[in-house]
Amino acid sequence: MARLTAEFGDRIYYNQVMDRGAMRQLIGRLIIYLGSNCTSQILDQLKTLGFRHATQAGISLGVDDLITTPSKTWLIRDAEYQAYTSEEQYRRGSIHAVEKLRHVVETWHTTSEYLKREMTSHFRITDPLNPVHIMSFSGARGNVSQVHQLVGMRGLMANPQGNIIDLPIQSNLREGLSLTEYIISCYGARKGVVDTAVRTADAGYLTRRLVEVVQHVVIRNPDCETNQGIRLHSIRDRKTTRDAGGNSLLSLQERLIGRVLARNVFLGKRCIAIKNQDLAPDLVNSLVNFPKALLSPGSEGGHCEILVRSPLTCKSMPRACQKCYGWDLSCGNLVEIGAAIGIVAGQSIGEPGTQLTLRTFHTGGVFTGGVAEHVRAPFNGIVHFSISSSTHKTKTIQPTRNRHGRPAWTCPEAFSVIIEDRIGKKKVLNVPQYSLLLVKNHQYVQSRQIIAEVRASIAPLKEKIEKNIYSHLQGEVFYNPIGLRASCLKQRHFLHFLCSASRMNLWIEFASIRSYLSPLVEKTSYIWIFSGRLNKFFNATLNLSFFYQTQDYIQRDLPIGIQNHVFNYSKVFLLSIYNRQRSVTFSVSRRDIRLGRKKKFTDYIPLSRISTDKIFSKHTGSIHTISEQNEWILTLSFVDQFSKKMFSSVQTPGTSKVSEKSEEQIIDFQEQLILNYPLSKTTIFLKEPSILAKNYSIAEKDSCIGLLGEFFIFLNELSIVSVRTFISTSQINLFLKKNVFSLLCITHGNTFKGKEKIFFINDSKNIYNIKNWLISVNFLIWCHFSNRILNKNQTLATIFLSNRSLRNEKDLQVKEFKIGQSICPSRDLGEKIFEPFTHSILPESGHLLSLNEGNLLIRLAKLYLIPTGGIAHTFHKQTINEGDTLVTLAYERLKASDIIQGLPKAEQLLEARVGNQVVINLYMRFEILVARIKEQLRNYIGSLTQMDLMLSQISVNRASKALEYSQLETVDQVQKVYLSQGVYISDKHFEVIVRQMSSKIAIVENTDFTAFSPKAVIRTAFPYDVLGVFFPGEILDISKAQKMNRVLYKPLPCKPVLLGITQASLNANSFLSEASFERTITVLSRSALQGRMDWLKGLKENVLLSKMIPAGTGLKQAPVLLSPNGTGTLFSNNEQNIFQKKNVTSLSKSKGQKVQIRKIFSFQKSPQRLSFLYQETSSSNIRRKIQPTVCLCKPFITKRNWLHISLKQLTEQSLNYETKKFCLQELTNNFIPRKKENIFYLKKKTIKTT
């Protein structure tokens, strides 16, 4: 022992578990410090050592090692109870089908994930050396999901379409599956086989498209000498409100390794890293871990972000340079010149998708993902809590309706919940901010009951789909009155109010009025009523105000006010017809009701938005009058019967469609309330898109309309009316043309059947004894009400007093059966109306037809709840068959998070499809933020004033920032898709792809409003423009546009485009590359008509023609041109004829051998096409190679040994379209303008000879 201690005493000993991550770090450091040869030998020895120890250890796996978690029993029981509760609520009509499906899926998903966490902790505590636990958590074989299926529960399965089956598999593979569970589990096996076959082809096609778009990108030069760069940051999970930062998926250190600095980094006044220095791991750790305060503002200005060079900012378009690309990740050094980085980038992104498609076979198609956490009660007790902020202003919880259709409350901030049992034991539970509270204060809860739902730290993947609800019966459709509708339209903080006995405006100014429009469904939603104060104008007298207190919470089924007035309408009904409006003749019977002594009431009649579901007449009539004898009189004009096509199209608010020669008129309701313009065929109605949400169903029986949500029951009288409604407060906001039409309608939120048959049998006047307990249906609370008398200047204040809970006394409810009412199934009819029905259970839901002393006649029915936004496909009293579509619901559902759903998301990002929400946001930001992209494309050369230079520099900086943001956001989004699967791909590969996607601009017309017109355009001295060179819609490279704008008087009208990888491949500079990719016939036909030429600069074009590819050793340096007479000029010609034959020589230096290249330009008079001969002669080789190629001419004029060209002469030449384009491109590539002269001078190129 002493010998061993002496031998190894001076060596460092590491005690660390060598898992997958540690091995990756070890191999990386070995390659950097020792090289690949030594690393391979060391890894071979490690492999031998691992096999020997694995043989000696002899870990085995048996059936007894599969231990089931004890908490599975009560978790399954709780999930089954919640699923049963959702099914019962769906049968009663309390929730709709989407809420039921969502609740069942999320309940089982939450149970499965919770059981997985319990399984992990159970293994760690009871048996940490369990072979199953060791194998799965060491990374040797298996993962947590597979072990969970063995000893936990298989959970929810996903079908081949990725949809989640709502029937879970409760058993695990250790216990064995039932027949139904086995059939469902076969979905997963089939899904794995199908994905292996089909999805692999999809991933391979993605690789082909990626390689196609960047196959020509090659490292061409060492440095492009750019001063631009990008700032990187760590990539985190999807952010939520509770966890603003999220978990780090990719650290900043990993993203910086192998990059090159674009700017010096200073620590104080000392430079610690210089520009163009590559970042090794040690230097990256030092830079990132420096405190922010020590970094000088000149470098990174208090940021942790380092400015590094990137292919996105490289000036060597369309190639790249060594400095901007950085390290070759295979060797840890700068990439070599000639490396085909485009091919490497395409394969690096596409190949992991091909390999990851095999993962679904091993997981068996089991659905996994992040879930919301629950705060449960530890024992039985009473809940106590209070919410208050640090600013001593009480923040009340806001009532809402959760995703499962149950009442909940949103918590504005984090707070504590105290649970106290009978003996005084207390437990404090912390509820995070913006959680959903599912219990009320001072409520009794049971053990393990869910108190609050905490939002998931990682938002699960969701998708928006539509679900059709089909009829389970054959029969007739009846729509209950479409709920309550409370709306308050904010318009200049005023509401139009029609005063009584006069046609003038009385305005109600609100101190705090909010825009609010929410359809309310009975027993499932809530209403807010706002308060305000009255301002009197024109000495108008108004004694009472029907406005409640600010934000008083009012439950749906509670009585709100009692008044003694009933209006009996006879034969009032409405037929809703799409695109046609039919009105019928009806009459209104008046009934004068005395309201009290010396009191005046005003009916609240707001202005209603005109839509097609209202009753229109040819002329508007009187609306509302009140006499002076303290009586209430309601009058309506008679409506003649007519049927006319009112409008031809449904338009959104703010637009109008009119006939020709019509002038726009705006109705000012403050000056004139009633306009008697007749209707005509050209009248267009301003219609909101949601048609079905505004259809008010009016029954064909005698109806009564109540005011402002009243609930009153008259006993021992001939009429018993129950009215619970609120009056709509929407307003007219019209912009009509030509024939202006206005209508003020008396609108109501709901109508109720008020015949004498309510609570009567065959018009009998006997009334049965009805208990007068008024109980809320929503929360089952005994409530006693005390109503204050309305004085002159007081607002109505209804006080709600709750005494005790009725949790165990659910049978004592309001006797609310009446003729024509729909009854939910499984309701106890005991002590409802008649004694013979005591303790009778209704087996099925139905429609109550008649009440007799001995029996009830119920028509079998099925209840369906339609939420907001649902699209109904049937009408009231329509006969349908079984299986017909009733309604279509749009909702979000969870989506499986494997690579099968990840690859389509990455493909949507790379293809820049508009259907993807992320791409929409990026594209909108790309167009909005790059509002002045034209300044970036233009190189300002000429006489600049100081102000012009400052303005142009600001525009260029702004456009550059916007373009950089859009590119980096796309890179991060695609990176997150692969990081979610545990695959890290270097950022530089994504940047090469994204650069090609965003390197194009589209030519637009000058009259296009999307074209960019910079404020500080630098005008050159040329008065001529090159017209007809580019057509609108033509795609150009940004680099070409930059060069063209140098010689144009007016910059090209263009806008940036974000092309997908397929479109970018089809808009390449090589028609051979385009034709060999897709749409061969289309590309070749278009190229032949345009006379395109291929310069064979990419890899694919040379491979097609069996030439040496311009990469690696086949990359040639660009030749340096010299003049034949050695005077430093390329051409020396004093003749004015631009079409002539001229021999030009140039010199190239390659591999130490001087090769003389002779280019012969053969010009003809006014040619359309020219022949181009390329002769290569060598001093060491007498052979000559002559290769004919088709190209176009370069027209030029020489004068005084300087080459210049007149744009006027170019535009007047009889050249075709492609020739003009070529001439313009070649001019901008070789010439620069001289200040204040109509001459373009040649770029002088010198060569150093030894």
UniProtKB/Swiss-Prot annotation:
<comment type="function">
    <text>DNA-dependent RNA polymerase catalyzes the transcription of DNA into RNA using the four ribonucleoside triphosphates as substrates.</text>
</comment>
<dbReference type="InterPro" id="IPR007081">
    <property type="entry name" value="RNA_pol_Rpb1_5"/>
</dbReference>
<feature type="binding site">
    <location>
        <position position="314"/>
    </location>
    <ligand>
        <name>Zn(2+)</name>
    </ligand>
</feature>
<dbReference type="GO" id="GO:0000428">
    <property type="term" value="C:DNA-directed RNA polymerase complex"/>
</dbReference>
<keyword id="KW-0862">Zinc</keyword>
<dbReference type="Pfam" id="PF04998">
    <property type="entry name" value="RNA_pol_Rpb1_5"/>
</dbReference>
<dbReference type="InterPro" id="IPR012756">
    <property type="entry name" value="DNA-dir_RpoC2_beta_pp"/>
</dbReference>
<dbReference type="Pfam" id="PF05000">
    <property type="entry name" value="RNA_pol_Rpb1_4"/>
</dbReference>
<feature type="binding site">
    <location>
        <position position="321"/>
    </location>
    <ligand>
        <name>Zn(2+)</name>
    </ligand>
</feature>
<dbReference type="GO" id="GO:0005739">
    <property type="term" value="C:mitochondrion"/>
</dbReference>
<dbReference type="InterPro" id="IPR007083">
    <property type="entry name" value="RNA_pol_Rpb1_4"/>
</dbReference>
<feature type="binding site">
    <location>
        <position position="324"/>
    </location>
    <ligand>
        <name>Zn(2+)</name>
    </ligand>
</feature>
<dbReference type="InterPro" id="IPR042102">
    <property type="entry name" value="RNA_pol_Rpb1_3_sf"/>
</dbReference>
<feature type="binding site">
    <location>
        <position position="224"/>
    </location>
    <ligand>
        <name>Zn(2+)</name>
    </ligand>
</feature>
<protein>
    <recommendedName>
        <fullName>DNA-directed RNA polymerase subunit beta''</fullName>
        <ecNumber>2.7.7.6</ecNumber>
    </recommendedName>
</protein>
<comment type="similarity">
    <text>Belongs to the RNA polymerase beta' chain family. RpoC2 subfamily.</text>
</comment>
<keyword id="KW-0479">Metal-binding</keyword>
<keyword id="KW-0240">DNA-directed RNA polymerase</keyword>
<keyword id="KW-0934">Plastid</keyword>
<keyword id="KW-0150">Chloroplast</keyword>
<dbReference type="GO" id="GO:0003677">
    <property type="term" value="F:DNA binding"/>
</dbReference>
<dbReference type="GO" id="GO:0009507">
    <property type="term" value="C:chloroplast"/>
</dbReference>
<keyword id="KW-0804">Transcription</keyword>
<dbReference type="GO" id="GO:0006351">
    <property type="term" value="P:DNA-templated transcription"/>
</dbReference>
<dbReference type="GO" id="GO:0008270">
    <property type="term" value="F:zinc ion binding"/>
</dbReference>
<keyword id="KW-0548">Nucleotidyltransferase</keyword>
<comment type="subunit">
    <text>In plastids the minimal PEP RNA polymerase catalytic core is composed of four subunits: alpha, beta, beta', and beta''. When a (nuclear-encoded) sigma factor is associated with the core the holoenzyme is formed, which can initiate transcription.</text>
</comment>
<keyword id="KW-0808">Transferase</keyword>
<dbReference type="InterPro" id="IPR038120">
    <property type="entry name" value="Rpb1_funnel_sf"/>
</dbReference>
<dbReference type="GO" id="GO:0003899">
    <property type="term" value="F:DNA-directed RNA polymerase activity"/>
</dbReference>
